[in-house]
């Protein structure tokens, strides 16, 4: 489930975090212990932060930025933006020339606006931070490289997220499955072994939501592709995609998917797992955080691991979160100093402990947050170390993003499992629909 979906969750997701006051105290302590460049008096820096699932993390970011400003003579205003509304608000701000001085964006929006020349390139700052902290993880480095589109790197990564495989150890281990499945075939086998409605083995969404696009990753792990290496000609119809559809149909026929999973909204898999009705789901760490607070027994019975692989290897996309500076900002130096400050290990350790992100810098894996005591962060560390760039092995471009937002692959899956179409007919439709989208970007 994406961060953008989380504001739609049922009430169990909106409970206040008891440690908010502690987070505020931590921010003050961090600011006192870290030096930052002095800045000119009388200016105001506006920062738009991305509102995430964790109230602790949101408050820590606000307090830390304001504390940095107070210590450096820079008036600050931090506005936390619901990520469902980020694109709308940023687009309006660009049109009205009212952008903040710095902000958080996801990779997709950053790439789109970077292509339009909205953001300052930050190659020197990217190198400085990387050199100071052991270098950037390869997946982060590749995913965040906007040079081809924007003439340079337009953002400084601060966290990665993506889907992990969540599993019920209490159901699987009595059946002899102590380790996470390494392949999608093994996943289907384990899911079938513990399938006992109303507890279903495989809580994967096959609906027209972001979670449904996990099926793209499964297809790619079987060797299927959306398009060619140039990112222009759609290549969905293939023997490799046929192999993926066979895997899907076989699992469906075993009855391992929960009823209604082809029409779930963005919270469907979350709710199934938290209600004890799914042995496996693919999701971000938000489900684990909810279970830890609201159902500690379920949390202790859960494990988090990387997505399985297929005949062509593991496809486990990371989504990189960026801090960017609009070119229109009159506070370029101050914004750069703030972003550098926010990359310091003390702040990031505190932030990782309460946020739902994995590390981006190699030195961060040595932070206390990733010492193994938090099973969610263990999974996110593995994602950071081994995750693949968005769309890999396909080309991540505007056409691919458009195809994803139209849920072409989940719709193909629905044709097979709900409408009973044969594989060729389903692939032909998906191929034609996707090519129509790609043709718009020629």
Q: Model-predicted segments: where are they?
A:
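Glycine-centered hinge/linker elements that transmit conformational signals in sensory
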Residues: 191-195, 231-261
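Conserved C-terminal helix/tail region of periplasmic/extracytoplasmic solute-binding proteins
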Residues: 2-8, 44, 75, 173, ...
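Hinge/lid segment of periplasmic solute-binding proteins
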Residues: 107-162, 214-217, 303, 371-374, ...
């Amino acid at each position: 489930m994406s961060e953008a979906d989380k504001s739609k969750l049922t009430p169990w997701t909106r409970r206040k975090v008891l440690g908010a006051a502690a987070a505020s105290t931590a921010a003050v302590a961090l600011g006192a212990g870290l030096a930052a460049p002095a800045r000119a008096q009388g200016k105001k820096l506006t920062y738009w932060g991305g509102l995430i699932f964790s109230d602790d993390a949101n408050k820590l970011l606000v307090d830390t930025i304001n504390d940095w400003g107070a210590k450096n003579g820079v008036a600050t205003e931090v506005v936390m933006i619901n990520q469902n509304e980020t694109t709308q608000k940023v687009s309006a701000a660009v049109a009205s020339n009212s952008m903040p001085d710095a902000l958080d964006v996801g990779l997709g929006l950053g790439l789109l606006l970077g292509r339009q020349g909205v953001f300052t390139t930050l190659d020197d700052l990217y190198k400085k931070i990387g050199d100071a902290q052991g270098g950037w993880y390869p997946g982060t480095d590749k995913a965040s490289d906007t040079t081809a589109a924007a003439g340079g790197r337009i953002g400084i990564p601060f966290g990665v997220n993506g889907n992990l495989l969540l599993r019920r150890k209490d159901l699987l281990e009595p059946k002899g499955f102590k380790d996470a499945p390494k392949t999608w075939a093994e996943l289907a086998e384990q899911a079938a072994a513990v399938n006992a409605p109303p507890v279903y083995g495989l809580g994967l969404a096959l609906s027209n939501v972001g979670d449904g696009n996990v099926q793209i990753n499964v297809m790619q792990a079987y060797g299927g592709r959306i398009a060619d290496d140039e990112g222009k000609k759609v290549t969905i119809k293939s023997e490799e995609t046929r192999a993926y559809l066979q895997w899907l149909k076989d699992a469906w026929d075993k009855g391992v998917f929960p009823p209604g999973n082809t029409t779930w909204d963005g919270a469907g898999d979350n709710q199934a797992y938290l209600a004890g009705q799914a042995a496996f789901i693919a999701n971000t760490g938000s489900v684990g955080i909810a279970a830890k607070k609201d159902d500690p027994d379920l949390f202790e019975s859960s494990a988090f691991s990387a997505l399985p692989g297929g005949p062509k290897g593991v496809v486990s996309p990371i989504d990189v979160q960026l801090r960017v500076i609009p070119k229109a900002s009159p506070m370029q130096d101050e914004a750069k100093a703030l972003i550098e400050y926010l990359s310091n290990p003390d702040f990031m350790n505190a932030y990782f402990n309460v946020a739902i992100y994995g590390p981006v810098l190699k030195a961060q894996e040595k932070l206390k947050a990733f010492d193994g005591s938090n099973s969610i962060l263990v999974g996110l560390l593995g994602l950071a170390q081994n995750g693949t760039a968005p769309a890999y092995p396909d080309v991540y471009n505007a056409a691919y993003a458009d195809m994803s937002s139209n849920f072409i692959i989940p719709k193909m899956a629905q044709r097979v499992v709900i409408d009973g179409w044969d594989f060729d007919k389903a692939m032909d439709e998906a191929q034609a629909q996707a090519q129509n989208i790609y043709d718009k970007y020629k």
